[in-house]
């Protein structure tokens, strides 16, 4: 649907010995991670394990103090092709006041357009398609603040999809979303992965996304303690009750529809 290239066994994300401190306290301790083209990888772990910190560090929303990150083979500090990446933040982040659904989704095209120019046919088609995918086409002119939490999350997913990303990074996309919508998301992500896109997703429980996932990387106290097949649901519960990692308002994020503007 969004990506037309065939999967290749090339590294889309590579992180080596990544260390992050926040407020002088260690949050990530020597993280190594690989995500390949056409691969779906879950990040899992208990309270404060560093899942959200890791994904934000990988796309330069948070600085890391040590280590190396490469996106599509390019060192993070030199990476500029942000239109290749879509990012869906945690639903609990406040939404933009006064913004309508279609406006939020349209912002996902900014990295693929020249500033101040009107939407092209390709932009309008991508926006319309993304709204259809999340089943919110009939809410295009609705203000974000009037939507339920699950609907707001679906809008943020549509914004990322509108940019036609090759790498989709999602932070708890199923939190507060009904089972039907979770299954629809799983079907969508499976289609993207089948077309060659890569997915890195933070999850509390795998749920309907289980068949999609190639691997689960489990974090504990800022370290990788497991990297392999997805564990059974009863084993994942052993990781403990989930609380969201560090949160930042959507309005403060230096990205637009998954494209980090630098």
Regions found by a protein language model. Name each.
Residues 164:
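Conserved catalytic motifs of ABC-family nucleotide-binding domains
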Residues 216-229:
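H-loop (His-switch) and adjacent beta-strand-loop-beta switch element
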Residues 67-81:
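Conserved ABC transporter NBD signature motif
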Residues 203-204:
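H-loop/switch region of ABC-family ATPase nucleotide-binding domains
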Residues 168-171:
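Catalytic Walker B motif of ABC-type/P-loop ATPase nucleotide-binding domains
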Residues 121-139:
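Conserved ABC ATPase "signature" region
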Residues 143-147, 151:
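Conserved ABC ATPase signature
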